[in-house]
Amino acid sequence: MTNFFFILASNLALTSLVYTADTQLQEILNSFIQRYVFVTEEDTTQDEHSKIEDLHKKRNFLASFCKLIVYNIIPVQCGSDVFKHYVKYYNQFGDIIKHTVGKTREINKTSCAITMVNSLITLFQQLQRENHRINKQSEEYLNIKELAKRFALSFGLDAVRNREAITVLHRDGIRFAVNPIENIDDPTGPPPNILFLDIILEFTNKLLKQDKRLVLQFLDRKIHAGMPSSRGEDWQPLVSYRNTLIQGEADQPPTTSRRAYRARKKDLEEEHMDEDE
């Protein structure tokens, strides 16, 4: 079916038959799904038969929306707000979301990987808004970790075929984790999103050895080797993530003084502006 739409789109005489949803319509459709499908409130007055019918209706709504993604009517990235519910609503819609993840990966592995990391970022930011400090033992945080694990497993064992997609996922995750670099609450502390490295750590076993080296270099450029020598608990996500990237390598985690770390923050901000990687 995807090939059929591609043929239509590539034939000028048939382009009028191809419909692409604009941004406004994409937002309306997504809003409908979030409001009427992914809802936790239950009507206690409903009998069992009504509940089953209601679930069936929701599944049809979700399946129809996912078909629009799979058939390229709306961009793959629109699936991030669906992917993020994979763990929380696994019993109700897990099969539909899993199938959609698989199909989007077949269409474009890299776009699928970007959609995955965006869904993880969305959940992480939501957790940040709800909690001044994220509890790594909380159910919400563990659900994000579990979602990352399931995403990683969905790539299978062929690291060569998935190498570009996985590398892009890591780079996007690193960008988020170190941006902003400045910690308002603690000038010598880590970037406020540094804990996100614990999430993308779940994907490190999908990297080829040579790609681990490239991701490590990218990480060091972004963080500017700015890890203070004291390495408190707040820096542990960076330590753990970096250690998984240097397994089998001779490199050791970089150490710098807190003064050097503060001095380099300004340089890093300028690098973010100039670097398109």
What positions do the PLM features span?
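Long internal repeat-built scaffold domains in very large eukaryotic proteins
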Residues: M1-E277
